[in-house]
Amino acid sequence: MKDFESLKFQINELVNKELEVLNLKVYQINNLKEFENDMIQILVEDSLQANKPLDFDILIKANDLVSNKIDQLIKTKDKYLLEISSSGIEKQIRSQEELLKALEQWVYVQLNNEIKKVKEFEGYVTKYNDQTNTFTFSFFIKGQKKNLDVKFDDIKFIRYAVRF
């Protein structure tokens, strides 16, 4: 879609405002090609509980709330598809603020460098120490419980995970 990057901020603001009534917020906005049409994909999450599963009914309500307003904002004769979807149960945690919302949640973590002989793990985010700016993770390696204090900058990649 032409000028998508210039519209992205406006779409984000508009959608966040409209979805407040459903306790939803934008996680990410993408412009994709689907067959020969442009697609605007808006990934949303619960604004109160970041990793709360969203059901199909609430996504339909979200689509109904924003569809016409986005048409008015974009004002294009080109055809495009609008998709409102959940950001997913294993979505990436992209910032320290998002990680703070993941306290007591099960996550998958890759570190930039080994810390105490650990480079990656799955475990709980158990606490945050604002004085040392570190998160404590609790996990098991070979049946042994481990706790690891990590600064957000030492994390290469982190996402929510499903514990089996």
UniProtKB/Swiss-Prot annotation:
Keywords from the UniProt entry: Cytoplasm, Ribosome biogenesis
Principal location class: cytoplasm
A GO CC term attached to the entry: cytosol
Gene3D superfamilies associated with the record: Ribosome maturation factor RimP, C-terminal domain
Q: Where does this protein come from, organism-wise?
A: Mycoplasma mycoides subsp. mycoides SC (strain CCUG 32753 / NCTC 10114 / PG1)
Q: What is this protein called?
A: Ribosome maturation factor RimP
- Return the similarity comment: Belongs to the RimP family.
The protein's matches in InterPro entries, at most eight in alphabetical order, are given as:
Ribosome_maturation_RimP, RimP_C, RimP_C_sf, RimP_N, RimP_N_sf
Q: List the disulfide bonds.
A: none
Q: Where is the signal peptide?
A: none
Q: Which GO terms describe its biological process?
A: ribosomal small subunit assembly; translation
Q: What is the lineage of its organism?
A: Bacteria, Bacillati, Mycoplasmatota, Mollicutes, Mycoplasmataceae
Pfam families, per database record:
RimP_N
Q: What does this protein do?
A: Required for maturation of 30S ribosomal subunits.
Q: Where in the cell is it found?
A: Cytoplasm
